[in-house]
């Protein structure tokens, strides 16, 4: 995309390529330098501009040309150089010299290696120096004044008891009364109302204000679900462009506000690995619009496994109000062996692994109200129910 976009808690920062202008929500501002430069498919963003919205320090050095960026602050082990010495590629006096250091220079100590210490110089060179060449080793606190965005969203003061409601047509919305008649204890319902229909971020909607009104009368909030199940939609094309993401986000929020919906539930499945960064940017941007418009944002996730880390659960836990584990499909119709839809250990692992990344008060575990009956034969496995 030809637009740099950075989300704050309740604002969006946008800067067009090769321009000195940028906007914070609806307010246009200018800098005395070009904010984003492009060369072919590569974009370069001015570090001074980034420093307005991200917590880091930087210094530029020559010979060789490099930028040293400090983004982690807090305690560091430091030491001073006793006398003029050298930082080398490896431990050992025969190892090539990377940088000459002067008496009194401060070095960051990264680790001890026998008689040598791995250090980082002020100019960003990482190498090794003899322990005997250092003195005054002590911990120092490195800090920078910066106010982190407050991503506090909506937190209900009750446990969420949610059910997804499979709705496939506008007429099917009339079934809510029968669907709720035999239930008790629910406080949230998520109808399958929105689907992404093309790569430009347009959606189809079967939302119903009558449905929402009835749910509210029954004491339920409505978190409308949006899916990416249309096979004609290319997730990369949809999510890697600012314009299509923005269109999708605006359409979802507008539809929610027009129908009195309380929240949006994102059910994007089978996201390719290389689309993960674009997907989480979509979640970030959608979270801002939801926060401003008092809409609950929840995101559906698989049970954590190595192959789905690109869904960025930890970042979801910052941006979204609730992270929902789809705690099922341990075995399914296409499985090579018969087994539980959601065994105890499978569900337990899903919750525990999610809690490593997401605050407990944001986690919802979804359980399946279904069983699968398999027939196992010597040459095949058949699902019959």
Language-model-derived ranges and their functions:
Residues 104, 117-121, 129:
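SH3/SH3-like beta-barrel fold
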Residues 142-246, 251:
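Glycan-recognition patch characteristic of GH18 chitinases/ENGases
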Residues 190-195, 256-271:
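Short acidic catalytic loops
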Residues 161-165, 187-191, 222-226, 264-266, ...:
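Hydrophobic faces of well-ordered beta-strands that scaffold small-molecule active sites
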Residues 1-113, 135, 143-151:
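Primary recognition of N-terminal secretory signal peptides and signal-anchoring hydrophobic helices
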Residues 33-40, 176-179, 196-203, 235-242, ...:
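Second-shell loop/turn segments in exported
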Residues 199, 203, 250, 273-376, ...:
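Substrate-binding surface in catalytic domains of secreted glycosidases
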Residues 2-7, 373-385:
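Single conserved hydrophobic/aromatic residue that forms the stacking wall/gate
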């Amino acid at each position: 995309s030809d637009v740099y976009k950075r989300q704050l808690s309740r604002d969006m920062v946008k800067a067009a390529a090769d321009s000195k202008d940028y906007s914070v929500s609806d307010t246009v501002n200018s800098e005395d330098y070009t904010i984003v430069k492009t060369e072919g498919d590569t974009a370069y963003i001015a570090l001074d501009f980034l420093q307005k919205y991200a917590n880091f320090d930087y210094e530029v050095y020559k010979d060789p040309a490099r930028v040293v960026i400090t983004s982690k602050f807090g305690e560091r082990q430091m030491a001073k150089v006793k006398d003029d010495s050298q930082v080398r590629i490896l431990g050992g006096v025969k190892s090539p010299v990377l940088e000459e250091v002067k008496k009194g220079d401060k070095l960051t100590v990264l680790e001890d290696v026998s008689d040598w210490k791995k250090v980082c110089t002020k100019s960003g060179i990482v190498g090794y120096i003899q322990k005997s060449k250092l003195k005054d080793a002590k911990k120092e606190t490195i800090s920078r004044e910066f106010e982190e965005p407050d991503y506090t969203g909506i937190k209900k003061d009750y446990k969420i008891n949610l059910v997804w409601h499979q709705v496939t047509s506008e007429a099917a919305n009339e079934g809510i009364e029968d669907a709720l008649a035999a239930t008790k204890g629910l406080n949230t319902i998520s109808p399958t109302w929105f689907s992404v229909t093309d790569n430009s971020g347009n959606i189809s909607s079967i939302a119903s204000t009558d449905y929402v009104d009835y749910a509210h009368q029954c004491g339920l909030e409505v978190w409308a679900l949006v899916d990416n199940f249309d096979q004609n939609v290319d997730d990369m094309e949809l999510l890697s462009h600012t314009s299509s993401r923005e269109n999708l986000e605006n359409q979802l929020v507008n539809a929610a506000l027009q129908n009195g919906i309380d929240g949006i539930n994102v059910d994007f499945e089978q996201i390719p690995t290389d689309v993960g960064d674009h997907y989480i940017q979509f979640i970030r941007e959608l979270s801002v619009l939801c926060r401003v418009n008092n809409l609950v944002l929840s995101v559906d996730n698989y049970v954590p496994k190595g192959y789905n880390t690109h869904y960025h659960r930890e970042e979801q836990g910052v941006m979204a109000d609730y992270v929902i584990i789809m705690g099922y499909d341990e075995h399914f119709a296409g499985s090579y062996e018969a087994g539980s839809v959601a065994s105890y250990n499978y569900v337990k692992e899903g919750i525990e692994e999610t809690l490593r990344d997401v605050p407990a008060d944001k986690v919802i575990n979804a359980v399946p109200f279904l069983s699968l009956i398999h027939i196992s034969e010597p040459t095949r496995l058949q699902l019959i129910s």
